[in-house]
């Protein structure tokens, strides 16, 4: 299903978490575990986008009390290779009032639909390769299942991802993270709901509860259709909670031109 069918099934996105540790370090904080993937916090959803191209602009922030806000602008281009496979290349920068903007990672994301309406629950496989462009170098891979279902006019998403770093991304334990979304189709041009993200630590030995990350908050989505194949899609969320046990606020925004 194409992103242009948002009145029937909507779209959103994400990735996951090494940038959080860098954000805390930039803010002058120490952090125990290093998360591997330089993230963008957008809930991953997968649709039949065959033949559609996607120009992608993303922007997200982390703000801790009495610390400078750290920002991550991102730019990408995606393509629906087939009815089941969507691929995207994008770059992520990082900066703050105390650190000049610099290229952080280059990323290649692939999402493959395993079911297309045969079951009450849609299932897909997400995989992302991350190449660190900062001094430490190295790379990371993130992968895991993407789950989606509908209850009336409300779409429910739940994803669990693992990521593992190599080289400068610290070849340590494989880490586990989660993301979820509730999206209600109120009007064809306006959907609202909530999103949540978290990092649990090593997949087989979670961090203590007070060292984990859990954030959630309200989200809004809108679509401006130009014709049957072209549209602007915009989503934004404001998240409250913690980053590895420290209080933090996050803002995420994503604007796409689908054509």
Protein language model features and the residues they cover:
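N-terminal signal peptide c-region/cleavage motif recognized by signal peptidases
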Residues: 32-34
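Residue-level detector of alpha-helical transmembrane segments in integral membrane proteins
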Residues: 11, 26-27, 211
């Amino acid at each position: 299903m194409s992103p242009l069918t948002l009145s029937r099934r909507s779209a959103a996105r994400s990735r996951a978490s090494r940038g959080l540790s860098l954000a805390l370090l930039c803010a002058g904080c120490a952090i125990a575990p290093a998360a591997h993937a330089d993230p963008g916090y957008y809930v991953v959803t997968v649709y039949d986008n065959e033949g559609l191209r996607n120009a992608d602009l993303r922007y997200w922030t982390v703000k801790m009390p009495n610390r400078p806000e750290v920002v991550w602008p991102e730019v990408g281009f995606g393509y629906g290779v087939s009815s089941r496979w969507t691929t995207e290349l994008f770059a992520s920068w990082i900066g703050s009032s105390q650190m000049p903007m610099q290229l952080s990672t280059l990323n290649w994301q692939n999402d493959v639909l395993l079911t297309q309406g045969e079951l009450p629950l849609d299932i897909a496989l997400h995989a992302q390769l991350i190449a660190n462009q900062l001094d430490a170098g190295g790379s990371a891979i993130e992968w895991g299942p993407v789950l989606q279902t509908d209850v009336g006019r409300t779409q429910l998403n739940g994803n669990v991802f693992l990521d593992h770093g190599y080289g400068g991304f610290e070849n340590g334990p494989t880490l586990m993270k989660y993301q979820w979304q509730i999206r209600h189709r109120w009007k064809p041009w306006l959907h609202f709901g909530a999103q949540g993200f978290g990092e649990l630590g090593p997949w087989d030995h979670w961090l203590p509860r007070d060292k984990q990350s859990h954030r959630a908050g309200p989200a809004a989505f809108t679509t401006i259709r130009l014709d049957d194949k072209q549209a602007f899609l915009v989503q934004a969320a404001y998240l409250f909670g913690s980053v590895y046990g420290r209080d933090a606020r996050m803002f995420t925004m994503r604007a796409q031109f689908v054509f």
